[in-house]
Swiss-Prot record:
Name of this chain's protein: Small ribosomal subunit protein uS5
Alphabetical list of InterPro entries matching this protein: Ribosomal_Su5_D2-typ_SF, Ribosomal_uS5, Ribosomal_uS5_bac-type, Ribosomal_uS5_C, Ribosomal_uS5_N, Ribosomal_uS5_N_CS, Ribsml_uS5_D2-typ_fold_subgr
GO molecular function: rRNA binding; structural constituent of ribosome
Protein encoded by which gene: rpsE
Family statement drawn from the similarity comment of this UniProt entry: Belongs to the universal ribosomal protein uS5 family.
S5 DRBM domain: residues covered: 8-71
Length: 163
């Protein structure tokens, strides 16, 4: 977990060396998948490709900063259960009680830590490809709505929950 000068958390999810076969042999380049978040409900991801690793990381970070979304959080967890989908990847995101921690692997864990979630249960279904899992996670988080937003859409006033 790395913080930059703007207080953003940057996480490298996946770094890949790819080869293009040309007449003289193989040409190598790199692709980097990076997640950026502020730890307070904002998160974004980016994919960068270049001939050198640092340049690929820089491009990925720039794209991640441009694709930031807001996520409504309640006491360090999600407001309700959601299923994010992208391609063959499905990611189930469930709110968890205090002290549970982040029960997630790989790409999902990076997103949850960057967005500022402290307690969550997750399950990646259908694929283990980091690109698709990451996009499914972000799609799920992007579709979350706060109680105020839902009330506004329905034209209802928000009341205190019944016990």
């Amino acid at each position: 977990m790395e913080q930059n000068e703007f207080g953003l958390i940057e996480k490298i999810v996946y770094l890949n060396r790819v080869a293009k076969v040309v007449k003289g042999g193989r040409r190598f380049s790199f692709s980097a998948l990076v997640v950026v978040g502020d730890g307070k409900g904002s998160v974004g991801f980016g994919l960068g490709k270049a001939q050198e690793v640092p340049e690929a990381l820089r491009k990925a970070t720039e794209r991640a900063k441009k694709s930031m979304i807001e996520v409504p959080l309640i006491d360090g967890t999600l407001p309700y259960e959601i299923l994010g989908r992208f391609g063959a990847g499905h990611v189930l995101l469930k709110p968890a009680s205090k002290g549970t921690g982040i029960i997630a692997g790989g790409a999902v864990r990076a997103v949850m830590e960057a967005v500022g979630v402290t307690d969550v249960l997750t399950k990646a279904i259908g694929t283990n490809n980091p690109h698709n899992v990451l996009r499914a996670t972000v799609a799920g988080l992007a579709s979350l709505r706060s109680a105020e937003e839902v009330g506004q859409l329905r034209g209802k006033k928000l009341e205190a929950p019944r016990k």
